[in-house]
Amino acid sequence: MSDNYVALLGTKGGPAIRPGSSMPTSNLVVMSGQHILLDCGLGVTKGIVDQGMALKELSLIFISHMHSDHYLELGPLLHTAWTAGLKTKVTVYGPKGLDAYWDGFLASMKADIDLRIEDEGRPDLRNLLDIHVIDADKVYEQSGLTVSALRTEHPPLIDCFAFSFKTAAKHVVFSGDTAPIKALEDFARGADLLIHEAMLESALPALMTRIGNGSDKLMTHWLRSHTFAHDAAKTATQAGVKRLALSHLIPSDDPTYGPKDWQDACADHWSGELIVGGDGIKIEL
């Protein structure tokens, strides 16, 4: 295994899980000697340890936007890491609203946190997180790694970001949640790997039926705020990236659709290596 890789911890688009589905969005980026989390959907904690990483080694997290499938387990992850030995600060970069989420989580767990400090002698969890609100442009730079953000088109949210992770030798881009936008082509120009969200157009009506408690507004959201697989393929081609991986898959739990359907959806617009995401997949850089 290379010293630089991406692990797709959770590859499902949307917050719900059903029998046979993958888990919501989370990713582990290992570059320039750093282990970085991007998004913390449900299941991220187990996803990390399944990759062989100790939770107490957490240090840097990026959150793309304030939809629950991207940050729901941030609080439980940090609390579990704390009980697993975390004693150094974790830095989180994300949109406005994360601080309110964290304050609410701490308030909900106050009795347990106070008890473990008193009864077990642990450091105060409330002092172990630094949150930085991000905007587009360069977000982070350290040890030869530069992380940049691009605001995407994901209405009704305004603060939703794609991320670029770049060293002198490697370049990885995550689309974040977005409708197709020209700016992402420039942002991902020449990247070694583009990880792009994707939907299968023909599968959406059946998914609406399975969900059962959404109105036509949900379909409207998908169509205006996300990207079909064939459009992700077009973006990858226009950006001149070396490899394309599909993640945040909608749907991820319909047994009538498999990897070939995703490959067929991209075939007319992408001729390079295509990776159809699955939970736990490691992609070497």
Where is each model-derived feature located?
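Binuclear metal-dependent hydrolase catalytic cores
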Residues: 1-179, 184-186, 260-284
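Cap/insert and terminal regions of metallo-dependent hydrolase folds
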Residues: 162, 171-173, 179-278
